[in-house]
């Protein structure tokens, strides 16, 4: 007997619908922490709207009754080219949020990247499923701490290390300022009132709020005081980081090493020349430099600069399966999605993240079928045209 889908699942029929549901479920300060960008949020909006300038040229007579979405990336097979990207404090959206999302990724057959600012630790996340696990790190003022995180990830069996290079300073996130939100989480009077109005979230998180911390920054034997830990984390950001630091990390980490936050073709070329194994074209979801271009807009120039020597991935504004298809047609090997996992968590925890991934899978399969594409390897630039990227006409 087939049971009907839960009511929330029937309503959550797109990533946009999931965002709206998360907005209704969360206190405003918590929702805005995930949803907001830097300053006027021009880059945040461009990440999504830029995909609309890219149009698909279908070839329906190719005959594609079956579609294969699987890829092989860094020697591991993934069921589809959609990876859960790193987001801090996922445990603020659902209890044990990071591990819920990681289990959903494992069940879906795809990879999960743990944020440096996760509530759970590297070691705790390593217990969640057998799918590929990646770890995000920064170059810290204390270079020894960078080494420590890399060594912990290696010991825990992580498949890849993701060095985020565009967070040397914290972006000016004005929604958080208006809401009185800070790290550690402090919501101000309006924020506290908003929390009180979200009874379901408040009840679910009643035992968690006081325990939320940045797990990877807590020293052995130290109380997990989030004020102490958050202060330590903020003080570690280092605007003096340079390519020599990347070289040192390359020596430490023997597995796949990716740079996240690459937008300039010259940086892409330099990264490959210095032995980097992969690039993630990203503007940090519009949360850092407002005025940076949309990730998808610069993707073709990064792909051209790399010339097939290493995989190129993309994040930023990927809200439809068709967005993934467009990115892959323009040369990306896979896309990362970050905010959508938080919306899934806010709605239904692990089940919400699993549903989010299934939406991408279904939409990708449908779009590929409508375009006459059977396999990921068949996606190419002949599938798309856009005025903003290369000026071609159909």
What residue ranges belong to the model's regions?
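Alpha/beta catalytic cores of nucleotide-metabolism and tRNA/nucleoside-modifying enzymes
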Residues: 1-52, 294-314, 318-394
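Active-site-adjacent beta-strand anchor residues
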Residues: 37, 115, 136, 261, ...
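Short, conserved beta-strand segments within well-ordered enzyme catalytic domains
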Residues: 55, 70-72, 81-85, 111-115, ...
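Glycine-rich active-site/cofactor-binding loop and its immediate structural neighborhood
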Residues: 78-117
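Alpha/beta enzyme core
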Residues: 89, 103, 128, 144-314, ...
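A gly/proline- and charged-residue-enriched helix-loop-helix capping module
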Residues: 107-128, 132-146
